[in-house]
Amino acid sequence: VKLVVTEKNIAAQKIAELLGVTKAKADKVYSTPVYRFERDGEEWVTIGMRGHILEPNFVPQLIYKKRGGWVGVDADGVAIPASIPDDLPKPPFKKKKPFIPEGVELGAWKMDALPYLVYAPIEKLPKEKDIIRSLKNLAKKADSIIIATDFDREGELIGSDVLTCVKEANDTAPIARARYSAITKEEITRAFTNLVDLDTNLAQAGESRQDIDLIWGAVLTRFLTIVKFAGYGNVRSSGRVQTPTLALIVARERERMAFVPEDYWVIKGDFNHGEMDFSAPHATARFKKEELADVVMEHVAGAQEATVASVEKKKRKVQPPVPFNTTSLMAAASAEGLSPARTMRLAESLYMDGYISYPRVDNTVYPSSLDLVDILKRISGNPAYRPYAEELLKKGKLTATRGKTETTDHPPIHPTNMATPEQLAPAEYKLYNLIARRFMATLSDAAVVEGTKVTLEVNQEPFVVKGDVLAVPGFRAIYPYGLKKNEQLPALSEGETVTFKGAIKTKKQTEPPARYSQGKLIQEMEKLGLGTKSTRHSIIERLYTVKYVQNDPIEPSQLGIAVIDALGKFAPHVTSPDMTANLEEEMTSIAAGSSAKEEVVTHSRDLLAKELANLIPHSEEVKEALVDAVAADAYVGPCPKCGKDLQLRTSQKTRSMFIGCAGWPDCDVTYPLPKGKIEALQEKCSTCGMPQIKVTAFRSKPRVLCIDPECETNKEPDLVVGMCPTCAEQGKKAQLIARKNPRTLKRFIRCENYDECKTGYPLPQYGALTATEEVCEHCGAPMVIVTTNRGPWKLCPNFSCPGKAEEAKKKEAKAAAKKSGKKTPTKKKTTSKKSAS
């Protein structure tokens, strides 16, 4: 039996389908899915991991022995050598957490434990016990084992962990490595025909990153959490890459806050030629003094004609873009409305389904082994691409653009198979379309842009307008992304007269530096060496999760600013990108074989120890900064009862948000909150004067609400939507009424005889509600219409309606058919019939 081990279950399934001579048979070993098939007369089986199957953690205890010095002790009592600095206190200690008579309890989140935690030994523990058990069961029976995890640092580390586990079960079976850049039949066949050895150096580089991130993340997070203000909830997160990334965002915000806007004036003239209106700004783009602008306005006042003083035309070439690597893909997708984190999730899905190549790459140069002609032929199956692909194929020899980064592990991101909008979900196709068009653009000719500059004179005052025209579309025919809209100009000749319709003077102010978009931040992180192609998007996502940042473009919260200010004041190297970038370089040197893992990890421990020594004496000052910041972020307005702050709070029991008074328990004022992202607003309710909030529910536009449930703006009249089907079965007549709870603001439908029949249905919380005279044919509940920004939506409000299960099955079938490229019958809408009432 040949055993193939992949990083994920879906990869195991796909590889089995692509390699098998016979159809792959799905099976289970214990609870883990496996796929069996035959190839070359042998039995093969594939099994997928769930990412990392082992995870690093600190030993729970450090013990000091007079003869042997410090040792770490794992959960089973096994001693692990430890290298603890001599300047840290040694036992005997008084029994007071985190200390025990003979050592230190590292599990205790206490300030005194942190200097020891920096140097504590790290052990690898099983993370996926069921999968490991299944893996070992298969390994025992295997004649040979092939590791087929992703080919990058993380994939090689997972492969190394797999190697450790399988050797415990079978230390004689030969083990090889399959490396591939796309999940297509050709690429997988090539990889399994040309097996190599596991790259130990690359795996060690991955393990060093894992260990360093654990050490820095655990120590800094525990420090911030220990000093946090009790009552404001969660762990305060920090990390080796996360913190300097946040520092970039805060530094930009500081620039904006320090920016002093200056007034200036602009003058825009309106013109007409033939049937086309157009506008042109004055040749002086900005007037710093209003008096100078007024002089121009006096000169042109009353004028009705303008003369075309000059028409200048210049042609310039615009070169096609270079191939996508991970960073440039995330930046381009961000400009199209896809966040970096979502882009990578979609890219991973497209890769697993065989539509694009491996999406985590630095390379921007297509290797000579990549068959560009074959890829063009494949994607030309999409009618939207066919004319462009065929035009490129007619060129004969294809010449691709080249970026600055060339690596040998994976090619740049490119399409590997044809896809159409019918085969993919809208967001998936949006990303696939971007990648496919970029690929064709890299093989296309330069675009030629003809720039036109027209100078018009009105009573000797010059107005200048510029416009660009694509003289030769080149790559822009297939890749329109990033095109700027230009002023449309009529055909004008020097000396011509055009109609002058007047001028407008507008006062403006200079703008502060723009906040980072997620795409721009990804690019800045790459430039500064923060994180890797595989981690940058998740670091940004983490900053949002822990509420250090909000919105896009990215704005730091008061808490995010306070964390950077506190750490930057007492431990500036923690917030600087330089130290993190240097550590990244050292980890890269491990992969190259020029540095050892232990040497790099020890260096990182020493750096952190110095920063921690600066932080601990100032923990009270850090605490005060965090207290003020959390309170500022949580502030909603003054309490109407006691005058103290109303604050956004999280319930310890339900984890749902509410508004509570900072004077609790002396003041018991609270207000419920609807589900969704909540943001306090400065503007007060115009009806009752109470604070307002902005609520953004999932997949909905933001709404502004008054926090007081008793406010008239929160009330809705009761609406009769039909007759109760439960009462009707018992020969009674009772109405179903839609109403809004005055306390929670939740909407629902209930029978007026609810105490007896208990019939009730939930309702969507947003949208105008309209009754119909129809009932659901499946359950008899009244059909209602909810009108939102997306338009009207007719629904049965009964969550237990049998028709909903049928709809769900149809959706699943349609989704499955989309994935396999098959067409499905048109879905029938839920039908209704006229109510008898």
Residue positions per predicted region:
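Basic, low-complexity terminal or inter-domain segments flanking catalytic cores
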Residues: 1-3, 165, 221, 258, ...
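Intrinsically disordered, low-complexity regulatory segments
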Residues: 1-216
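Long, highly charged, low-complexity internal segments
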Residues: 41-47, 51-124, 233-348, 352, ...
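Short, polar/flexible loop-turn hinges at active-site or ligand-entry regions and domain interfaces
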Residues: 120-123, 149-151, 169-176, 196-203, ...
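C-terminal or mid-to-C-terminal helical accessory/interaction module adjacent to the motor/catalytic core
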Residues: 141, 183-269
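Short glycine-centered, acidic/aromatic-flanked micro-motifs in structured strand/loop junctions
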Residues: 149-151, 331-333, 360
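Short, conserved phosphate-binding/catalytic loop or strand-edge motifs used
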Residues: 181-186, 326-327, 346-356, 539-542, ...
